[in-house]
């Protein structure tokens, strides 16, 4: 079974440019966790599944730690998810930087990791 949180919207100060550090930018995070959640489905017990609120809070906490590269944020967030949710067999994250300052109009830039 896969649990997904889609389009978590975050404002953060990642990037190589001084303006990004000061002004910040908009980000979108998608997280999916795979595991055997049938027991929680049968028991209707939150303690036996992934708490969606805890996932969202972990995303916000990791996005709040500044980095120059979104790749750095992604790897750090992925590691934290694996530690926090050991009952997930696999964790996937897509981190999207909206309107990255690239000199040309690009809607977004994304990095993704799963495992």
In which residue ranges do the predicted regions lie?
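N-terminal, polar/charged subdomain of small-to-medium soluble alpha/beta proteins
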Residues: 1-115
